[in-house]
Amino acid sequence: MAGQTIIVSGLNPAAILQSTIGGGASPTAAAAAENGTRKVIPLSRDALQDFMLSIITQKLQDEKQPFYVLDLGEVVSLMDQWKSALPNIRPFYAVKCNPEPSFLSILSAMGSNFDCASRAEIEYVLALGISPDRIVFANPCKPESDIIFAAKVGVNLTTYDSEDEVYKIRKHHPKSELLLRIKPMFDGNARCPMGPKYGALPEEVEPLLRAAQAARLTVSGVSFHIGSGDADSNAYLGAIAAAKEVFETAAKLGMSKMTVLDVGGGFTSGHQFTAAAVAVKSALKQRFDDEPELTIIAEPGRFFAETAFTLATTIIGKRVRGELREYWINDGLYGSMNCVLYDHATVNATPLAVQSNRSNVTCGGSKTFPTTVFGPTCDALDTVLRDYQLPELQVNDWLVFPNMGAYTKAAGSNFNGFNTSAIVTHLAYAYPS
């Protein structure tokens, strides 16, 4: 079965994984598939690209809208990596990163819990039949209406970093357990630092614990976030050390024993994850080895989402200025590529020349030109790529962007009437080679 790809569009993700049972699938894949009943067909190892081409061929007859492909095989592989590297840390996937329902479903089937930041995100998760006790409401500053909703539906674990939040929770959800969100010592290498906005300073920890104690609220533990996409695994070392100090302060105040440590997010896949896992385990052993009953959770988003999604866009316009080629595509910085601005992402494009070069759609060996790629809106800021090398392409050819799962569609807008939320996601399962 290795090297094959199963392709399906619009099916229950668990049904897709059903065909992995008995075919060398990992235990994670098998567990995710146990309730699946619908048949899927295995295809050749190149079928993922073939699948995209088949979708494009269908779209040649209609409006040629952009689309995503979600590779569930990649998600299974990433979950296996997580459980192998961090077996004692429960992932609570950060829904804000990418709330695609099929993606949430497959993560749930593989045992992930969920980090939600709003009522809407809680509703996304509950709508999939997921129990509220698998949700942490990990937003330190919540509208009162959202706290009331959390109490109503039974989401009973949340974060705080201010006295005002204590008062809101005491008033509207006194049964909720709290995690004190602290500011990490260092998050300077994160793509998106969290420290300037969230997290208690060292001198604020004791007053915030006392405030919760006076309000007769239960502080079950500590949370932190080193920042989204942090490349420096050493950031976890200082943050975990600071968390231990909070545990000790709570004990000195006579508070109930803390039982939860939330090490937040910041994880990326690949070699950086390996380094982060080593750093986290080392720090936990050093600081919390005397806490055998401690529950440790994390809030990975990018780790699971980024590499699992591929975006396909149509070339809708072209201009030639000497050697320079300029193309307009039907998604851009106000849509999925908002990650270039807000997430400091670097995007890469590969061609599928279905209109101009059908005998060599990937344009292998073709001459390339300095290229600018614009998004579809009227704003000149909407420029996806500059000084990028691409072959000669034409209107109705396609550009494909890999690694487009993290903070893309989730943060897109409908500016100029280009509706990011309407972009369709197709499902595939590519077995690891």
Curated annotation (Swiss-Prot):
Signal peptide: none
Lineage of the species this protein comes from: Eukaryota, Viridiplantae, Streptophyta, Embryophyta, Tracheophyta
GO MF: ornithine decarboxylase activity
Site entry (Stacks against the aromatic ring of pyridoxal phosphate and stabilizes reaction intermediates), positions: 225
Keyword Ligase part of the UniProt annotation: no
Residue numbers binding pyridoxal 5'-phosphate: 228, 266, 299-302, 407
A Pfam family matched in the record: Orn_Arg_deC_N
Subcellular location per the Swiss-Prot or TrEMBL entry: Plastid, Chloroplast
List of residues that carry N6-(pyridoxal phosphate)lysine: 96
Main location: plastid
Gene3D superfamilies linked: Alanine racemase (3.20.20.10), Lyase, Ornithine Decarboxylase, Chain A, domain 1 (2.40.37.10)
Active site: 378 (proton donor)
Binding site for substrate: 342-343, 379
Effects seen without this gene: Reduced nicotine but increased anatabine contents; these phenotypes are enhanced upon treatment with jasmonic acid (MeJA) and wounding (e.g. removal of apices).
Subunit-level organization: Homodimer. Only the dimer is catalytically active, as the active sites are constructed of residues from both monomers.
Gene name linked to the record: ODC
Required cofactor(s): pyridoxal 5'-phosphate
GO biological process: alkaloid metabolic process; nicotine biosynthetic process; putrescine biosynthetic process from arginine, via ornithine; response to jasmonic acid; response to wounding
Stated role: Involved in the biosynthesis of pyridine alkaloid natural products, leading mainly to the production of anabasine, anatabine, nicotine and nornicotine, effective deterrents against herbivores with antiparasitic and pesticide properties (neurotoxins); nornicotine serves as the precursor in the synthesis of the carcinogen compound N'-nitrosonornicotine (NNN). Catalyzes the first and rate-limiting step of polyamine biosynthesis that converts ornithine into putrescine, which is the precursor for the polyamines, spermidine and spermine.
Keywords: Alkaloid metabolism, Chloroplast, Lyase, Plastid, Pyridoxal phosphate, Transit peptide
PROSITE patterns assigned to the protein according to its UniProt record, in alphabetical order: ODR_DC_2_1 (PS00878), ODR_DC_2_2 (PS00879)
Disulfide bonding pattern of the chain: none
Gene Ontology CC: chloroplast
Pathway: Alkaloid biosynthesis; nicotine biosynthesis; Amine and polyamine biosynthesis; putrescine biosynthesis via L-ornithine pathway; putrescine from L-ornithine: step 1/1
Name of the protein in question: Ornithine decarboxylase, chloroplastic
Catalysed reaction equations from the record: L-ornithine + H(+) = putrescine + CO2
